[in-house]
């Protein structure tokens, strides 16, 4: 793969594109985590592709991120780069865009929020967070996870 990806302009940025370029089925790709260097499982590869994360390159070699490192470094990112939080209506007035037109990812698992998840933030008066120059919120799965943790810690 070295010679294929030495030109930075031609590097595939998504797993789907990498799969096409190499003519290898997506789940047969063998990629390592950029942080811990462990090989990603098929499930981790599939999830990486589904949540539309981008590949990174080190020495002309593509890397992804495993689930454990993704959750860990998302938490680090939140603590290091959190700026402020706003409600949905405020976010729309700040950006002068509808929530449906904004690209918002989950601050915990990094999956893109669906229009329904964005609407839930407004209905339940949950805030969106500005972290590392990007708007984030909670996907439904992480919303349940964080709500369950809060409930368990108060019991």
Curated annotation (Swiss-Prot):
GO terms for biological process: DNA-templated transcription; regulation of DNA-templated transcription; symbiont-mediated perturbation of host apoptosis; symbiont-mediated perturbation of host ubiquitin-like protein modification; symbiont-mediated suppression of host innate immune response; symbiont-mediated suppression of host type I interferon-mediated signaling pathway. The gene is E6. Belongs to the low risk human alphapapillomavirus family. The cancer-causing human papillomavirus E6 protein has a unique carboxy terminal PDZ domain containing substrate but low risk E6s do not possess this domain. Belongs to the papillomaviridae E6 protein family. Forms homodimers. Interacts with ubiquitin-protein ligase UBE3A/E6-AP; this interaction stimulates UBE3A ubiquitin activity. Interacts with host TP53 and EP300; this interaction inhibits TP53 activity. It comes from Human papillomavirus 66. One of its GO terms (molecular function) is DNA binding. Keywords: Activator, DNA-binding, Early protein, Host cytoplasm, Host nucleus, Host-virus interaction, Inhibition of host innate immune response by virus, Metal-binding, Modulation of host cell apoptosis by virus, Transcription, Transcription regulation, Viral immunoevasion, Zinc, Zinc-finger. This is Protein E6. Pfam families: E6. It is found in: Host cytoplasm; Host nucleus. The lineage of its organism: Viruses, Monodnaviria, Shotokuvirae, Cossaviricota, Papovaviricetes. The keyword Metal-binding applies. SUPFAM superfamilies: E6 C-terminal domain-like. Its main location: host cell. The keyword Metal-binding applies. InterPro entries: E6, E6_sf. GO terms for cellular component: host cell cytoplasm; host cell nucleus. Plays a major role in the induction and maintenance of cellular transformation. E6 associates with host UBE3A/E6-AP ubiquitin-protein ligase and modulates its activity. Sequesters tumor suppressor TP53 in the host cytoplasm and modulates its activity by interacting with host EP300 that results in the reduction of TP53 acetylation and activation. In turn, apoptosis induced by DNA damage is inhibited. E6 also protects host keratinocytes from apoptosis by mediating the degradation of host BAK1. May also inhibit host immune response. A zinc finger (unnamed) spans 33-69, 106-142.
